[in-house]
């Protein structure tokens, strides 16, 4: 099955080694010295605990912009979406020991309310270190993008969550896949693909970076 067939059928494609260890090390070092990104980060809470993230819309000429507009991301996105693409926003998520994860949601569940009329959008999630079940890696419901947009709502947390009753039914029909990956791997996934992550269950520090194009 080709990457395009995987994207259409399953809603996601994991590209191994999209960026080299040297490139990821450089990006990690750059994040560590960018005080403005750390200062603009906000703490949020979900049903499983807290986590920290920062987000921005305009790709700059710095290293962040070079990653998010890199042809290794742009060209596959153009194939998957069958159109020219533009940068919508970038995000860094810090998950420290004991931090929580995200509840089941669709990215388009948020973007629909930002005047994005069609779900012709996708995300690219770049691993900045090893991602596994213990440190709260991303998990997806295979093929769930085909159900279309699901209603999202806030309960007692700041983050939106997809309708729980519908999620329970979809979990009976769609395989839950943990995206265990290495630094430099990148997950491309459709804006309607349901995804979540668990809380960090041990003391390893994880810095997954979510690049949404």
Regions found by a protein language model. Give the residues of each.
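Non-heme Fe(II)-dependent double-stranded beta-helix
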Residues: 2-10, 15-116, 153
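A structural signal for short, well-ordered beta-strand segments
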Residues: 89-92, 124-126, 205
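Short, structured patches in soluble enzyme cores that scaffold and shape functional sites
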Residues: 106-108, 126-130, 142
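Short, conserved beta-strand element in jelly-roll/cupin
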Residues: 117-132
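Double-stranded beta-helix
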Residues: 133-194
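Short beta-strand His + acidic residue motifs that chelate non-heme Fe in jelly-roll/DSBH
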Residues: 195-201
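Conserved small/polar residues in nucleotide/adenosyl-binding loops
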Residues: 203-209
């Amino acid at each position: 099955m080709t990457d395009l067939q995987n994207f259409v059928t399953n809603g996601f494609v994991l590209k191994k080694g999209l960026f080299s260890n040297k490139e990821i090390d450089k990006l990690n070092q750059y994040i560590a010295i960018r005080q403005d990104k750390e200062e603009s980060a906000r703490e949020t809470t979900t049903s499983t605990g807290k986590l920290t993230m920062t987000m921005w819309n305009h790709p700059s000429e710095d290293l962040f912009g070079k990653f998010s507009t890199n042809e290794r991301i742009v060209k596959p996105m153009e194939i998957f979406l069958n159109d020219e693409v533009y940068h919508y926003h970038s995000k860094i998520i810090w998950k420290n020991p004991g931090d929580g994860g995200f509840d089941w949601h669709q990215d388009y569940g948020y973007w629909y309310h930002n005047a994005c009329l069609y779900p012709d959008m996708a995300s690219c999630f770049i691993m900045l270190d090893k991602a596994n079940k213990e440190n709260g890696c991303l998990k997806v419901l295979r093929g769930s993008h085909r159900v279309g947009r699901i209603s999202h709502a806030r309960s007692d947390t700041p983050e939106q969550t997809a309708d729980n009753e519908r999620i329970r039914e979809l979990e009976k029909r769609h395989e839950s896949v943990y995206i265990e990956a290495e630094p430099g791997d990148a997950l491309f996934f459709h804006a309607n693909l349901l995804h979540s992550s668990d809380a960090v269950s041990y003391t390893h520090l994880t810095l997954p970076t979510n690049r949404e194009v």
